[in-house]
Regions:
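Acidic, proline/glycine-enriched N-terminal capping motif
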Residues: 1-168
Length: 168
């Protein structure tokens, strides 16, 4: 073990069945609700949940993780649950009708940009920079991934160098 703790995840048979059934249900609901999103690595989502458990001793965190894993396994909404902003809005107890109510919707922000408009304005400026070659500016790409960069101050790239053809 090299002096490091080893953790083994264990999924009960009940959890495996829940995950499999829920993955199938997600795929069905995506079609029924016409949730037309092409999964990608940068789009983030809010996942708002209200749990109605049949008894008090249930753990919302475990169910939420299984829920996220099931949605990830479906590959219909997102590719990896690292793009999810998780929000458990309430936990109730309803022995007659246990359920989970889920609302999934895309966030407005894109990376460090608060809106599509802010991203477009930044990108339009980038197009006129020496660093922007066929859309491959590392600063812009990292900013779209949500990385905080020293090169961007107050919404402006401090590494901006105007293309020679525009300067003339």
């Amino acid at each position: 073990m090299n002096g490091k703790a080893q953790v083994t995840m264990y999924e009960t048979a009940e959890a495996k069945k829940y995950k499999k059934d829920f993955t199938k249900y997600i795929k069905e609901q995506v079609k029924i609700q016409q949730f037309n999103i092409i999964p990608n690595k940068t789009q983030h989502f809010y996942c708002d949940c209200v749990f109605y458990f049949d008894r008090i001793d249930k753990d919302a965190n475990n169910y939420f993780k299984l829920l996220l894993d099931s949605i990830t396994d479906s590959q219909c909404v997102w590719l990896d649950d690292n793009v999810v902003c998780e929000r458990v809005n309430a936990i109730y107890y309803d022995s007659k009708n246990p359920r989970i109510e889920i609302n999934i919707y895309p966030v407005d922000y894109i990376g460090i940009f608060q809106s599509q408009e802010q991203l477009s304005n930044f990108t339009n400026n980038c197009i006129h920079c020496n660093r922007y070659k066929e859309g491959k500016c590392s600063i812009l790409n990292k900013a779209k991934e949500g990385r905080i960069l020293e090169e961007i101050e107050n919404g402006k790239c401090i590494k901006f160098k105007c293309l020679k053809e525009i300067q003339n």
